[in-house]
Amino acid sequence: MVSEKMPYEYLNTPCVLLDLDLLDANIREMTDCASDAGVQLRPHTKVHQSAWVAKRQLEAGACGIEVGIIEQAEAMAHQGLHDIVVGHPFVGEHKLATLKRIASNPRNQVWLVADMVEHALGYAAVARGVGRELPVLLKIDTGGIRRYGVPPGEPAVKVATELTRIQGIHLAGVYGHEHGAENTEEGLSSKAFEDATILCDTARAIRSAGVAIDHVSVGASPTFRWTCRFIKEGKFPEITEIHPGNCVIGDIGYMMNGGNRRESCAVTVLTSVMSVSHDAYAVLDAGIKTFGADSLIATRDAPNFFWEGMPSYGSVQGRSDLWLGRLNAEGSCIYYRGSGGRLSLGERLEIVPNNATLVINIHEKLYGVRGGIVEQMIDVTGRGVGS
């Protein structure tokens, strides 16, 4: 039986650890950066999916939270989180029914994102049905991710104008999400500046067309520090809110994108050695069902991406000579590639995953640890919700 205040070396493996000292430090960095710039912080919760973590972020000064999908918003609202941006536009009977349940509670302030008039028509029908007006943010495609978003400039002005004619919603502002920056200081600063410029220019164009909007929301983990710096320097007074997410948790993928440092990654997988019968590798009890299967293949041109033809699926704490090169459903092979010594049967390793979002979404609980002790068992509120 697992209990709080027990040394985490006694936990059954595999399991997921959340280093609370690193979590708190990452929350402070995000909050201080936004506060110093004089901009509101609304952290995206898509990685940790935890109401417990989100409440710590609010206690530190965040103005609210962001989720990706409407089902996650309902899960968070049930846990007492009431000011929520839903980052992805949506349509459909089931999703609109979920919105109706959320909007029927007057305590809930849900902000919706649209990039088509059709999205807003569905939201507005719900709003009229519950007798309240709902705020909508117009998603702008600033380049990079190429997913949701109306093109900036005149196309955005056209959609914004049409949204003002729909009874039941009000156009609150514009929303953008940076993606695709090169992981260099120049690349990150350039992308932050470019996207902020596109969004602010579009906001000014919408206002010049006679449409009053209050909010300009930007942000992503790799670029948020640069965005805050530019806001502090007075370059983008239109920006009211930033919404980075992953940097509060961190993983190898975001480290490679400039979103966090290796030493600030707060989540690790605790795993045990199940076999040392081979000279070249040991077998662990954590596989695809624990790590997911993200090899970060999009970064395959990076130096040392492959070793012996294998990508890595995570980074072992304190053992850079080990290579997590092969995953199966319920186990993995970790290879020796240096002189660090062979692993022992039953030995435990902590591994920073490539993709913390996948790892956390697989598990029902995280074990919050501090100083080697389990301090908090943390429910993954959004696990399996809407996915």
Task: Please place each PLM-identified region on the residue numbering.
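Generic N-terminal amphipathic, Lys/Arg-enriched alpha-helix
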Residues: 1-18
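Conserved, mostly hydrophobic/aromatic
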Residues: 23, 46, 76, 138, ...
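Active-site loop/helix belt of alpha/beta enzymes
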Residues: 142-259
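Active-site loop ensemble at the mouth of alpha/beta enzyme cores that anchors a bound cofactor
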Residues: 223-309
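C-terminal accessory subdomain/extension
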Residues: 280, 284-387
